[in-house]
Regions:
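Conserved helicase ATPase motor motifs in RecA-like P-loop NTPase domains
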Residues: 27-29, 136-137, 151-170
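Conserved Walker A/P-loop ATP-binding site and its immediately adjacent core
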Residues: 49-68
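Conserved pre-motif I regulatory segment
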Residues: 1-25
Length: 175
């Protein structure tokens, strides 16, 4: 099913296409997930890519997975968290590595801020893009190091939120 973005979502998507990082601020209910999905669809048209989608809770990671897979197919999916899912799931670094190296398709990894460090501890994983949902959680002391480590190994990183924590040094894509 094709996604029809609203004007503010189109503006955010165009800004993302021009920059490899940014904070996308859209009000609650404004369609942040559809912006992520459309960006990922375009990115996954090319050569082999690994996408990481980070959420604050397992339930939200599972919901994002359902939303993404409603619009994106022909990808391998891994969940890196301790919750139940219908997809391959693990929190063991060696199993994450094995899954990553054994895949012959584009990959999408759904995880939580709590389990993100398991991905950054997997040395062979090269991440093409990371989408952090409810990104204000990424600033918490408990998750900051894992998020920082992930930003070092991924080509593109986007932080989606309706409630930003703003620093004067951040690059913002504000809708």
């Amino acid at each position: 099913m094709p996604i029809r973005l609203r004007p503010h979502q189109e503006t955010a998507l165009k800004s993302m296409q021009l920059s490899h990082h940014g904070q996308i601020i859209v009000p609650t209910g404004g369609g942040k997930t559809f912006i992520m999905i459309q960006h990922a669809k375009e990115l996954l048209k090319g050569q082999f890519k690994t996408v990481v989608v980070v959420a604050p809770r397992i339930l939200l990671a599972n919901q994002l997975s359902n939303d993404f897979l409603e619009h994106i197919d022909n990808v391998d999916v891994l969940h890196v968290h301790s919750g139940e899912t219908h997809h391959t799931s693990t929190t063991k670094t060696d199993e994450i590595e094995e899954w990553h190296l054994g895949s012959v398709k584009n990959q999408i990894i759904f995880t939580t801020y709590h389990s993100l460090h398991k991905i950054t501890s997997s040395p062979s994983i090269e991440v093409s893009v990371m989408y952090c949902d409810e990104a204000h959680n990424s600033c918490s002391k408990q998750f900051f190091d894992a998020v920082k480590d992930m930003t070092m190994i991924c080509e593109r990183k986007y932080f989606f939120t309706a409630t930003p924590r703003i620093s004067h040094k951040l690059s913002l894509i504000h809708i």
